[in-house]
Amino acid sequence: YTCIDETAPVINILHAQSITLVTYIDWTDDMGEYCEFRDRVKNKDTFALLDKCINRVKCADITEEPVSLGHDNIELKLGGGYSGEFANEELLDLQKNEHDIIPQLLERLYYNGLYGMQACAGTTAPRLSGLWVGEWNLLWRSAYTMDANVNIQVSGINSSGLYEAGAGYMWFILRQIPDWVNNAAMVYGMKDAVLIPVNTDGHRAMMVEYDINYPFQYWNAGAGWMLIPIYEFLQTYGDAVITTDDVALIKMYGKDTFDVRKDVYEPLLKKTYNFWKQIGNPEYYTDTDGNARYEKGKCSLNESEHYLIIPSFSPENKPFGYHSAITANAAMDISAAKDVINMYTEMLNYTKVDGYEQAVSEAEALLRMLPDFMYDESGAVKEWSMKEYGENNAHRHISHLYPAWPALQTQHDSKLASACRQAIINRNHENKGKDDTASHGWIHKALVEARLKNADAVYDTLNLLVHSDIFYTTLFTDHNTDRSKGVYC
């Protein structure tokens, strides 16, 4: 029975200094028909409210209010293909017999993506289940997963002019920051720094997932990734003010109005920078020849030495033949650290706060002490900048391509750009027929290829997806290209 049911059993406890209540809660869908279930509990007033709600819905004059995109400046017209109007399932069936992408289908997928983001916009980010699957008891607890899924889902909010989606994303972040600060303190003993978990329910974000194969407590790059859409929001709209009526947020921060730059971006960037400032330890370093070293009591690095970023985790992979995913010098970490430091120095040069010249000098010194990217015999960027690790390309994630997307480090570095392109080629070849059914992996590759200005590869990836079984008739997508997971992604 519910805890608010006055007829339910009550336990009275007297003269206790403290009480510990251990409960176990589970879901069930084995409740039978509603009428049978109601008869078993008909003496409980709890169901009066349910009956009232059902009767109100039956009597209500319900009108459908379509979600309005309201983006007159956003349009995609490809031309060609079939003439006439087709239902979604008709287009999907037609696509099965066409070698090339049907333009009408691609247009509709684009607008459907805009619709999905607009429908989710305003108060939070989209979660794994979205609004689109029809049930909530899904895989991965229908969570907000922040090592690829949320990131890919919000990747187009700024370039598409979805202002409300950007604001909702920031509310999503602001709810979590206190827990992020606590995570950094509990895992690493850091002060005024942030460390994010892989999953959140959208309200709390404590670090609760620890595993030798998925050691997300050592996923260092997450906060930098989550920061980038806010950075892009400022680039898109300039200085802006957002307002919330969320009581919990107002209570948490003591206000309902936030300056995006001063109240959201700059404080989070400073905490993210503080993380990278504190993780380096001179006792763990690589020498002039790139060999990993440990020297107890070492207090500073020599000119040709670099920090080891240790521990490190490259979601969700581990080196070939290595027993653990807890590693060092993940390329994702190196890239995220460089990106955050560059954003931080850019912020300092913009705000020119007292002592900013010294702070810029310290940040640039830290940048020089970070490890460099390493390259394998094929010329691909290595997922771990360590001589001791072998590449493991039979994997769905491409976290090591962070320099291309979401960062912009390949834009003016042709060697790094070529290395990222080769890394995708290696992944596609060595992971074929293994765990290459994860749709987020293919979309991630398409985003990287777009940044690398490789139009043919972007087209090939999209063509693979439209010929897979990824799409529901709503045109929303499954986690897997064979629709084996039943969860919107």
Positions of predicted regions on the chain:
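Acidic/polar, glycine-enriched structural segments that form the non-catalytic walls/loops
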Residues: 1-144, 163-167, 173-183, 388
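Short, flexible loop/turn elements at secondary-structure junctions
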Residues: 25-27, 121, 132, 136, ...
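Second-shell loop/turn segments in exported
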Residues: 36-39, 93-100, 139-140, 155-156, ...
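Extended, hydrophobic/aromatic-rich amphipathic alpha-helical segments that build helical scaffolds
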Residues: 106-120, 223-232, 267-276
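Secretory-pathway/luminal and periplasmic proteins that interact with or process carbohydrate-rich
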Residues: 115-125, 138-146, 165, 178-183, ...
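Zinc-dependent metallopeptidase catalytic helix centered on the HExxH motif
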Residues: 126-158, 171, 268, 272, ...
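The feature captures the catalytic groove of carbohydrate-active enzymes
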Residues: 128-143, 191-264, 277-362, 403
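Active-site core of glycosidic bond-cleaving carbohydrate-active enzymes
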Residues: 146-149, 158-186, 190-193, 203-205, ...
